[in-house]
């Protein structure tokens, strides 16, 4: 698989879970002999929600919530067939979203 690159983009709400998954992917790829670029921390996406505390009156009394989505990017340069097989067998945590582009 010469001159190819696998780009893996990970998203999670919990950054500790995300970093643990990134370490598993990097360790697996290095063990099979592939070169790694990253992990690159991408900007954290913050969604803020403002809702009324009361169901009826008091518009001025509000409560604020936010959801932070942490993201990482890993490039695997010149992956071998064993690298692809090892990544397919890898079992990551349930709270991590993985997008793979070849």
From Swiss-Prot:
Keyword match Ribonucleoprotein: yes
SMART domains: Ribosomal_S10
SUPFAM superfamilies: Ribosomal protein S10
Keywords in alphabetical order: Ribonucleoprotein, Ribosomal protein
Subunit structure: Part of the 30S ribosomal subunit.
Family: Belongs to the universal ribosomal protein uS10 family.
Function: Involved in the binding of tRNA to the ribosomes.
UniProt name for this protein: Small ribosomal subunit protein uS10
The species this protein was found in: Syntrophus aciditrophicus (strain SB)
């Amino acid at each position: 698989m010469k001159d190819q690159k696998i780009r893996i983009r990970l998203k999670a709400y919990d950054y500790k879970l995300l970093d643990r998954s990134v370490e598993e992917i990097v360790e697996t790829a290095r063990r099979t002999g592939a070169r790694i670029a990253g992990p690159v921390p991408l900007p954290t996406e913050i969604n803020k929600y403002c809702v009324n505390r009361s169901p009826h009156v008091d518009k001025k009394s509000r409560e604020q919530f936010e959801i932070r989505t942490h993201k990482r990017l890993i490039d695997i340069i010149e992956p071998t067939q064993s690298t692809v097989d090892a990544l397919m067998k890898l079992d990551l945590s349930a709270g991590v979203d993985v997008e793979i582009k070849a």
